[in-house]
Structures are given as structure tokens and as C-alpha cells.
């Protein structure tokens, strides 16, 4: 059993001691990083979340403390009292390396078994072991730095929004299921057997109701839940920085959030954000980068060759154009010497994005090499090279197909090649607003339109009349903030008219009865003078990944789930007692083989 503190107080953190503390008598508490016994002296590196302090025990300093210190092992939790002195041999690799603590008294607060993972920076252990022993993984200095960054980010956000007149308000966690998009996590009700709450995918509807309530500027940093198939860097529960404002238009929300981003990235990460941030309509983003999340840290933009080859007899080009598609290409500079095997791999790569194939032209010093050259006239080849601004050494990669296939395949290929060539500047932070999103996307399987963002998004004023005739052409008052090819956040101006919201539900295939059954409380609220309003939400976890310099979302969440939405630490989800299920009116059905 460990020793009690008995009134002993920590007076300094391990990572805080400097030369100006020399001569002070202090008490430090933390975990033993390592111990070195040099015979007459014992050195202990003591660690807490601020850093490491070297402690020296010796018979001449204090015999009892010296003998007791010989019993400590790695990860023992101890308290040491003594005097800070100048080190005879400073360690310039440590922030506290100019000083050390002469250990005059030691308390062993608790012992530790040999840890299953080595607690150090740059740990090389399996993800499952790290998550199973997460409380040990979180002791590592690089993990503790991440969560100090997370804390500071939340503080800067709160301070900024408070200074700009926002109120931090909470919205319900147990709410109504309104299935549209990702699956809800459902919570059975004991009082209303056979009925369920849902955990919120976002506070969307409630924050709009707060605007109807007159709170004007709302924010919260809140948990959200989505029961979806997990992809890389997705978690079933995640954290949003959520906000909503009344009496605003798009420019107001964007300008405020540019100032917020500049403040957060400067104060937390030391990163300068150039304002104003570039804005790019969705249509341009897709045509130039094949993505609504373009990475602008490198070029290799998509070029439209349709006009250059519109009269071509090459069946692949001709067929795509006649079917209403297009012929587009990217240029990989200095890649004309790429071998056939490498190009074949690129062929296979674009086929995973439903492209039928990949045509290529290698512009070499002494020749133009291409398997499609024989199908093109000299004028067509010249027009392609001019359109691509090609020079000797360049490789042109062409896809001809339906526009959505062309954009998606070339957009993915652009990123793939940039990573392979290592031409992306990892120290650059390129923000861009993507605007004028399509309001709706047609679901061919269900035979109806679906909201591209959510069904509460307002329409561009000039597109309102298209809603009843050509809904696929309607643009939304929506905006996403993208950083280095990743969506950092997104938002929109909202519909604030009950009748127009009903019309939107109708376009989405809802009957009036179904719309009122699911969203009647919102439609009813909109009858009582709702203000124009809009907002935005950031993925806090994604933001911390950028600020902390990690590519793994699990690194920025204290107790994350694994790729199967399972917690190796607590073994959740787990089987519950039959009496709990009976109380909820739930009966398990055994799965048949």
C-alpha cells in the first residue's frame, strides 16, 4: 500500500524548474521515467504532464531518502522534496537540463507493475495494445502535448466567441430520431416501452430553435454520434464546435469564422492564416481538382480537352462526348520516363473509381510516345499539348467518361501521384472556402432527391424558381472550409419560412404527413417569427489533428473506439443482463445460421 500525502503539497511541476529556481526548496510529484544507480548516487527522472526533472539522491544528501529511492521502479508514483541546484553537467536536450533536485525526502505514493507498453515519445506498439492500456498510452509526453493543444484550442475558441457576443448553450443528447443520411444510435425508453430516443448526429434543429427563441448567437463544443461504417479517421462519437447566428448572410458567417480560424491557428499552432481566405464555387473545384475538398498545396489541375478533341474519330473520346460526358486530363511534370508497369498501376487505380481506362501521352525530348497517337490527327495531338501547356518530360493522363466519373477518378489520381512524387509541402496550410454547393443529389436507387447537406439549407436567391422545375440545378447557400484537402467544417444559411420548409420536404419526397410527423415541432416554431439565421460547425477532432501534426484521429480523442467501433479498454459494446432488457421491453432474437 502506498504512502499517504498527509498534507504534503506539490509546489512546482516537473517541467517548470529553471535556473531562476536555484536555491528554492520544492516538492514535486509524478511518475518515475527511469532510474540510474551509480553506487553512491541514484538518479531518478521524474515525469509529469509538463516535462521531466532529474532528481539526485545520495547518502550525503539524505541517507534515508537515498536508501528508499533504491526501491523505486519505472512508473512508480512518488513525491520528492528537496532543493533545486545547478547541474554540474547540463543536459541541453532537456528544458529543465540546467538544474536538478537534491532529494531530501521521498514518499512512494503507489507502486507499478511492469507496464505492457514503454512510456516514451514515438511509441512503436500495436493500436490494439495502445487502446487496451489507453491510460498508460496517455501518459506518454507526445500524447499529453496533444491534449494540452486540444485544451488550448477549446479555450481560444470559447474566449473568441465570448468576446464576439456568443452564448454557450447546451442542447439535448436524448432526442428524436429523424433518419436521413447516417444511421442514428438508438436508446430504448423504459417509461415508453417500444419507443426510442436517438443520440444526436448534430445539434442542427435545436440550434435553429434557439434562434427562433431569440438567443441570437449560440455556440457549444459538443459530442455528436453517427452509427456509420467506419472509414479511416472516422469515429462513432466525435466532437463539434457548433455555432448559429441570427440576422446574418453568408458573408457574415464566413468573415467571423475567418477571424476565428486565424486566431486559433496563430495562438495554438503559431501558424499564420492569410485573410481573406480564398473562395471557390463547387463547380470550379470539381472541374479543376475533381473534388469538393481540393488540396491546393500543389498544382496538377484538371484540364478540359473536350473542345480540342470534339471532332476526333477516336472511339473512346467520341463515345464519351456523344453521351454527354467529357475528355479531361492532368499533367504530371517530369514523369514522361515512367515505365509501363507504373502506368498500368495508374490504369488499375482509376478503374477503382469506375473509369473505363486511362489514356496517356509521354512528351519526351525526341519523341511523343502514346498508345492513342495512332487514333489522333496531328492537329488533335498539337491541340492537346497546347491545352495542357506540355513541355518535354511531361506525362499527360487522360480520362474520357461521364463527368462525375472523370472528376472523381482524375481528382483521386491527382492526389495519388502527388503523394507518390512527394511534391506536397507538408509544412504549408492552404485554406479554401467551397461555396455554391448543389442543394440536392438524385438517389437513383430510391428514385428521389436527397439533401446534399441537410434539408434545412437555404437556396441561392437566383435559383429559387428552379426548385419546382429543375431541382438538380439548384445551388445552396452552403459553405465548407477546407484545409489541405480535408473538410474542417461546414455550414449554411437556413430556411426560416414554414411553408418553404414544407416545400423543401416535398421536393425530397416527404408527404406532408411524414414531414409533420418527423419535423412538425420545427415547422410549428417557424410560424412564430423566426429570424433569418445561419451557422457552421467544425470537427474539433480534425482541427486538433492539424494543430498537433498527427494523421490518426484516435491520437486526439482520449478514449477512442477502434476501426470496428469497439473499445478494447472497456470492451464496449457488451452484453447486458436479461432483466435490464426485460425492464425495457426488449427481447433478443438469436441470429439463425
UniProtKB/Swiss-Prot annotation:
Its main location: cytoplasm. Catalyzes the attachment of L-aspartate to tRNA(Asp) in a two-step reaction: L-aspartate is first activated by ATP to form Asp-AMP and then transferred to the acceptor end of tRNA(Asp). It catalyses: tRNA(Asp) + L-aspartate + ATP = L-aspartyl-tRNA(Asp) + AMP + diphosphate. It holds the Pfam family tRNA-synt_2. Keywords: Aminoacyl-tRNA synthetase, ATP-binding, Cytoplasm, Ligase, Nucleotide-binding, Protein biosynthesis. Homodimer. This is Aspartate--tRNA ligase. The keyword Cytoplasm applies. L-aspartate binds at residues 180, 226, 453, 494. It comes from the Bacteria. The lineage of its organism: Bacteria, Bacillati, Bacillota, Clostridia, Eubacteriales. It is an enzyme of class 6 (ligase). NCBIfam families: aspS_bact, PRK00476.1. InterPro entries: Aa-tRNA-synt_II, aa-tRNA-synth_II, aa-tRNA-synth_II/BPL/LPL, Asp-tRNA-ligase_1, Asp-tRNA-ligase_1_N, Asp/Asn-tRNA-synth_IIb, AspRS_core, GAD-like_sf. Residues 204-207 are annotated as: Aspartate. The keyword Transferase does not apply. One of its GO terms (cellular component) is cytoplasm. Gene3D superfamilies: Bira Bifunctional Protein, Domain 2 (3.30.930.10), GAD-like domain (3.30.1360.30), Nucleic acid-binding proteins (2.40.50.140).
Amino acid at each position: 500500500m502506498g504512502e499517504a500525502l498527509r498534507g504534503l503539497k506539490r509546489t512546482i511541476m516537473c517541467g517548470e524548474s529553471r535556473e531562476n529556481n536555484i536555491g528554492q526548496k520544492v516538492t514535486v510529484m509524478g511518475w518515475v521515467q527511469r532510474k540510474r544507480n551509480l553506487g553512491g548516487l541514484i538518479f531518478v527522472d521524474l515525469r509529469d504532464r509538463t516535462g521531466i526533472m532529474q532528481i539526485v539522491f545520495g547518502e550525503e544528501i539524505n541517507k534515508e531518502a537515498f536508501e528508499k529511492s533504491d526501491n523505486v521502479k519505472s512508473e512508480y508514483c512518488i513525491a520528492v522534496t528537496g532543493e533545486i541546484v545547478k547541474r554540474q553537467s547540463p543536459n541541453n536536450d532537456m528544458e529543465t537540463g540546467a538544474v536538478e533536485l537534491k532529494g531530501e525526502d521521498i514518499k512512494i505514493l503507489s507502486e507499478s507493475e511492469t507496464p505492457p507498453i514503454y512510456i516514451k515519445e514515438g511509441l512503436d506498439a500495436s493500436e490494439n495494445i495502445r487502446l487496451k492500456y489507453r491510460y498508460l498510452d496517455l501518459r506518454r509526453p507526445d500524447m499529453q502535448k496533444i491534449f494540452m493543444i486540444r485544451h488550448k484550442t477549446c479555450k481560444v475558441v470559447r474566449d473568441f466567441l465570448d468576446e464576439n457576443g456568443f452564448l454557450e448553450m447546451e442542447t439535448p443528447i436524448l432526442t428524436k430520431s429523424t433518419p436521413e443520411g447516417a444511421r442514428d444510435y438508438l436508446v430504448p425508453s423504459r417509461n415508453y416501452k417500444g419507443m426510442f430516443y436517438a443520440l444526436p448526429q448534430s445539434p442542427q434543429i435545436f440550434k435553429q430553435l434557439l434562434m427562433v427563441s431569440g438567443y441570437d448567437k449560440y455556440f457549444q463544443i459538443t459530442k455528436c454520434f453517427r452509427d456509420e461504417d467506419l472509414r479511416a479517421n472516422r469515429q462513432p462519437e466525435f466532437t463539434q464546435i457548433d455555432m448559429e447566428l441570427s440576422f446574418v448572410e453568408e458573408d457574415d458567417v464566413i468573415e467571423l469564422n475567418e477571424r476565428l480560424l486565424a486566431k486559433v491557428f496563430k495562438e495554438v499552432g503559431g501558424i499564420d492564416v492569410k485573410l481573406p481566405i480564398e473562395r471557390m464555387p463547387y463547380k470550379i473545384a470539381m472541374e479543376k481538382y475533381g473534388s469538393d475538398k481540393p488540396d491546393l498545396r500543389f498544382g496538377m489541375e484538371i484540364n478540359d480537352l473536350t473542345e480540342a478533341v470534339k471532332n476526333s474519330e477516336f472511339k473512346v473520346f467520341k463515345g464519351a462526348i456523344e453521351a454527354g460526358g467529357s475528355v479531361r486530363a492532368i499533367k504530371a511534370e517530369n514523369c514522361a520516363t515512367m515505365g509501363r508497369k507504373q502506368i498500368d498501376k495508374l490504369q488499375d487505380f482509376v478503374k477503382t473509381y469506375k473509369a473505363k481506362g486511362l489514356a496517356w501521352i509521354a512528351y519526351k525530348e525526341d519523341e511523343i510516345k502514346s498508345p492513342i497517337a495512332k487514333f489522333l490527327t496531328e492537329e488533335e495531338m498539337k491541340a492537346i499539348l497546347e491545352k495542357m501547356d506540355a513541355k518535354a518530360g511531361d506525362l499527360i493522363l487522360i480520362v474520357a467518361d461521364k463527368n462525375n466519373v472523370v472528376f472523381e477518378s482524375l481528382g483521386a489520381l491527382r492526389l495519388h501521384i502527388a503523394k507518390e512524387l512527394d511534391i506536397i509541402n507538408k509544412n504549408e496550410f492552404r485554406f479554401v472556402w467551397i461555396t455554391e454547393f448543389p442543394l440536392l443529389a438524385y438517389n437513383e436507387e430510391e428514385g428521389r432527391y436527397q439533401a446534399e447537406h441537410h434539408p434545412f439549407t437555404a437556396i441561392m436567391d437566383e435559383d429559387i424558381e428552379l426548385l419546382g422545375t429543375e431541382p438538380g440545378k439548384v445551388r445552396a447557400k452552403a459553405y465548407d472550409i477546407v484545409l489541405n484537402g480535408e473538410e474542417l467544417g461546414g455550414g449554411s444559411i437556413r430556411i426560416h419560412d414554414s411553408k418553404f420548409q414544407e416545400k423543401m420536404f416535398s421536393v425530397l419526397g416527404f408527404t406532408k404527413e411524414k414531414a409533420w410527423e418527423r419535423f412538425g415541432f420545427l415547422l410549428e416554431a417557424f410560424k412564430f417569427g423566426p429570424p433569418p439565421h445561419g451557422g457552421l460547425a467544425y470537427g474539433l477532432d480534425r482541427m486538433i489533428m492539424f494543430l498537433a501534426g498527427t494523421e490518426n484521429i484516435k491520437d486526439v480523442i482520449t478514449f477512442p473506439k477502434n476501426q470496428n467501433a469497439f473499445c478494447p479498454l472497456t470492451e464496449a459494446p457488451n452484453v447486458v443482463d436479461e432483466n435490464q432488457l426485460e425492464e425495457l421491453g426488449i427481447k433478443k432474437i438469436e441470429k439463425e445460421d
